[in-house]
Structure formats: structure tokens, C-alpha cells
Amino acid sequence: MKDRVTLVTGATRGIGAAIAKTLAEGGAKVVGTATSQAGAEKVTEALTPFGGRGVVLNVTDAAAIDATLKDIEAKEGAVAILINNAGITRDTLLMRMKDDDWDAVMDTNLKSVFRLTRAVSRPMMKARFGRVVNIGSVVGSMGNAGQVNYAAAKAGLIGLTKSLASELGSRGITVNLVAPGFIDTDMTQALPEAQRTKLIDLIPAGRLGTPDDIAHAVKFLCDEHAGYVTGTTLHVNGGLYFT
């Protein structure tokens, strides 16, 4: 992936930050997105040693996507590797869930992936090379009470990934999905110790995953030698869920 122009959405912290850093260390020219200027500056600080940078992008804004991709093409070149990581949650039980809760999660977690992948696919087809990795969730396969919107969006990514793999495979483009299990991030660190212990007891590996666990799985799928892997969902969950 050396010198491949790479776009990682949601690169400020956690899984996204780990992916951006790991790919940059591998030689990719990484641009990571954030939702604020402060976040973009944080991404730039992390990626500058590797020649990367951060940018502000609202992934639900179609015009902003177009403008950002034009900026990247002018400065780094056409995107060859796309990591669709940006995501939000609006957790609540179905009877309490508002339309806005549903729409916000769908727009960020699913529709943005459609828009971004559509936008980068043409230059990828022209180059006859591309890597698209969507970041899903074990919840997209298992479901989870209180996360109907999130689970539906992540399950939708599985179908999107398979369909795009079929459409784009003849052009040297692979499309895959990495589905993390329970990862040690800000969210899980905020859980009470008893709840964290209960969570870990469900995992045969006996621990929470780390952002680096996900990042290295993504790195494999981005490699030139992974060109025969496409349309797959790679579960990285310590044995919590088996396909």
C-alpha cells in the first residue's frame, strides 16, 4: 500500500485513529476526517510524521464529500483506499426511538458509505485498483436490544459490501467489511467494573479487543496481496460471535 492515497473517515480517536496510524506506518498517504477543526488538527498531529493530514468532513453532507475528495485529489491524488469508519449511536428502546434517532444513524453509518464509495469508485475503476473496507459491528449480525437503528445500519453494510464486491470486482477493486466485537475504547472504559467483567466473561478470548486488533485486520485487507479477498465480513471479536 506504499504511497496509496487513503481516506479514513472518523479518524479522531479509537478504531479510526488506530487504522489511520497503522496504514500511515505501512506507507500509505493517509487523510483522516474529523467532525471539527480541533479534531482535524489532532489527526494532522498524529499523521504528520508519516506525511498524512486531517480534514474536517461531515459525512452526511453530499456537497462536503465532493469538496473534500476534490481537495484530496488536488493535493495527494485520487483515493485508492477508502476506509468507511465514521459512525454514531443513538441508543434507546424502540418505543422511545424518534425518527430523528433512526435517520441520524442511517445517514451517518450507512448512507455516507454509499455516497463515499460511489464517489471514489470511478477513479478506482480507471486505475483498475481499489480497496474499500467498511467498519461494521458484531451487532450487525447478532442484533442488540436498544440498538435497532445501529444494528439495522450495520447489517445494511453487510449487504452493501457484498453487492459492491460483485459490481466492482472485475475492475481490480475489493470491498470488504471488518466487524469489531467489544473493543476497549472510551465507551467501554466508562462502564462500571462489574459490567466490564460481565462483558469479558462472554468472550472466549478473555479480554476486550483493542483498536489495534481492528487496524491490523484492516491493513491486511488493504494490501496488494489481498486482491482475491472480496465481499467478505471479517469478524474480529475474540470468539464472541461465530459465523
Sequence positions of predicted segments:
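Conserved glycine-rich cofactor-binding loop
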Residues: 12-13
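Active-site helix of classical SDR
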Residues: 117, 153, 161
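Alpha-helical segment proximal to the catalytic Tyr-Lys
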Residues: 122, 166-170, 227
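Residue(s) in the substrate-gating loop at a strand-loop-helix junction
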Residues: 137
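Short, small/polar-rich loop/turn modules that mediate ligand/substrate recognition or access, typified
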Residues: 169, 174, 229-231, 237
